[in-house]
Curated annotation (Swiss-Prot):
The gene is murI. Provides the (R)-glutamate required for cell wall biosynthesis. It is an enzyme of class 5 (isomerase). This is Glutamate racemase. It catalyses: L-glutamate = D-glutamate. Coiled coil: none annotated. GO terms for biological process: cell wall organization; peptidoglycan biosynthetic process; regulation of cell shape.
Length: 255
């Protein structure tokens, strides 16, 4: 099966990596809207328009399924995109909630949602979690992580300062952290390490990774089996510099 993966930039590589590892599709067309990243600081109307324009991009490629790997677009544009599409479109929020249902049985477990400003303000995760009975939910807009990751700053003083700025004021330590932006799994180990070191935790919080979550979701929904296909062919496209995007993909995905 030939599918598409849409993201605002390189963050969707975290989803793509999980898809490549699972080998459940034959061919993947990746489109990064890198000329307009970040999405998280833009208004909902603009994000919806970006989503519809992404649909126009994919039409000539004749894909059978589209994955919206961007949490911000999933929160604010997914419904509009689905209305204008004849093929199934899957976002990353519903799979993440399903992963929590499967892994977190304590409905009172403190859950922290990390995301861009736009994703957090949409309340998409908060509302979905409450519908499943999880009421001890807090959220934190951590938009500064996005430009750091886009610049391949995945460790070091700048990232440490950014984590300190966001996480020091936390009053309740989470047992579950939703990485509510597909950029964030690229610094997941650093986030986990920060919580362990600075809050003296005996065990790390459970990190919900949208890439792993969406593979599980797709397997369940479409009865797909891991390793059913050969290693997928991947084709990269971008609204900005596609050469730069391909270079980042080779470095991060080891292609």
């Amino acid at each position: 099966m030939k599918i598409g993966v849409f993201d605002s930039g390189v963050g969707g590589f975290s989803v793509l990596k999980s898809l490549l590892k699972a080998q459940i599709f034959d061919e993947i067309i990746y489109y990064g809207d890198s000329a307009r990243v970040p999405y998280g600081t833009k208004d909902p109307t603009t994000i919806k328009q970006f989503g519809l324009e992404a649909l126009d991009f994919f039409k000539p490629h004749q894909i059978k399924l589209l994955i919206v790997a961007c949490n911000t677009a999933s929160a604010l544009a997914l419904e509009e995109m689905q209305k204008h599409s004849k093929i199934p479109i899957v976002g990353v929020i519903e799979p993440s909630i399903l992963a929590i249902k499967q892994q977190v049985k304590d409905k009172n477990a403190p859950i922290l949602v990390l995301g861009t400003k736009a994703t957090i303000q949409s309340n998409a995760y908060d509302n979905a979690l409450k519908q499943q009975g999880y009421l001890n939910v807090s959220h934190l807009a951590t938009s500064l992580f996005v430009p750091l990751i886009e610049e391949s700053i995945l460790e070091g003083e700048l990232l440490e300062t950014c984590m300190r700025y966001y996480f020091t004021p936390l009053e309740i330590l989470p047992e579950v952290v939703i990485l509510g932006c597909t950029h964030f799994p690229l610094i997941a180990q650093k986030i986990e390490g920060y919580f362990m070191e600075h809050f003296a935790l005996s065990t790390p919080p459970l990190l919900i990774h949208s890439g792993d979550a969406i593979v599980g979701y797709l397997q369940q929904k479409y009865a797909l089996k891991k390793n059913a296909c050969a290693f997928p062919k991947v084709e990269f496209h971008a609204s900005g510099d596609v050469v730069w995007l391909e270079k980042q993909a080779k470095e991060w995905l080891k292609l």
